[in-house]
Swiss-Prot record:
Gene Ontology MF terms: lipid binding; proton-transporting ATP synthase activity, rotational mechanism
One Pfam family this sequence matches: ATP-synt_C
Gene Ontology cellular component annotations, sorted alphabetically: plasma membrane; proton-transporting ATP synthase complex; proton-transporting two-sector ATPase complex, proton-transporting domain
Family the UniProt entry places it in: Belongs to the ATPase C chain family.
Organism: Idiomarina loihiensis (strain ATCC BAA-735 / DSM 15497 / L2-TR)
Compartments in which it is found: Cell inner membrane
Entry keyword set: ATP synthesis, Cell inner membrane, Cell membrane, CF(0), Hydrogen ion transport, Ion transport, Lipid-binding, Membrane, Transmembrane, Transmembrane helix, Transport
InterPro entries: ATP_synth_csu_bac/chlpt, ATP_synth_F0_csu, ATP_synth_F0_csu_DDCD_BS, ATP_synth_F0_csu_sf, ATPase_proteolipid_c-like_dom, F/V-ATP_Csub_sf
Superkingdom classification of source: Bacteria
Quaternary organization: F-type ATPases have 2 components, F(1) - the catalytic core - and F(0) - the membrane proton channel. F(1) has five subunits: alpha(3), beta(3), gamma(1), delta(1), epsilon(1). F(0) has three main subunits: a(1), b(2) and c(10-14). The alpha and beta chains form an alternating ring which encloses part of the gamma chain. F(1) is attached to F(0) by a central stalk formed by the gamma and epsilon chains, while a peripheral stalk is formed by the delta and b chains.
Transmembrane region(s): 10-30, 53-73
Name listed for the protein in its UniProt record: ATP synthase subunit c
Length: 85
């Protein structure tokens, strides 16, 4: 039983870490491409900014879903009931 809890803690750490890493990379790429496009066509910057914020929200939502699944495994571990019988 302790092994399941330990492996769950490791899995939760990996899930949250990869979600944070993916979000950071996504925001970095998104910001870089936005600045590149705004420098190329400054008159489109307001329209691009709105679209950038929409995509930023979607990128952040994926990380939040990963954190929610990690919290599910932390506090309501479905694997413990299978081991306990």
């Amino acid at each position: 039983m302790e092994t399941v809890v330990a492996f769950t803690a490791i899995a939760v750490s990996i899930m949250i870490g990869l979600a944070a890493l993916g979000t950071a990379l996504g925001f970095g790429i998104l910001g870089g491409k936005f600045l590149e496009a705004a420098a190329r066509q400054p008159e489109l910057a307001p329209q691009l900014q709105v679209k950038m914020f929409i995509v930023a929200g979607l990128i952040d939502a994926i990380a939040m879903i990963g954190v929610a699944v990690a919290l599910l495994f932390t506090f309501a571990n479905p694997f413990l009931t299978q081991v306990a019988g």
